[in-house]
Amino acid sequence: CEDGGVPSASCRANTEDYRYCNACYLQEVIGK
């Protein structure tokens, strides 16, 4: 998630922001 400034790996590690990171992570996977 370049916009959020948090890498997908970090998102996966942070369960607290799982919702925000999850959406971002999915977008990255779908985008690629």
Swiss-Prot record:
Protein's name according to its UniProt entry: Turripeptide XIV-18
Record keywords: Amidation, Disulfide bond, Neurotoxin, Secreted, Toxin
Organism ancestry: Eukaryota, Metazoa, Spiralia, Lophotrochozoa, Mollusca
PTMs per UniProt: Contains 2 disulfide bonds.
Intracellular or extracellular location(s): Secreted
Domain text: The cysteine framework is XIV (C-C-C-C).
Tissue: Expressed by the venom duct.
Main subcellular localisation: secreted
Modified residues (Isoleucine amide): 30
GO molecular function: toxin activity
Cellular component, GO annotation: extracellular region
Domain of life: Eukaryota
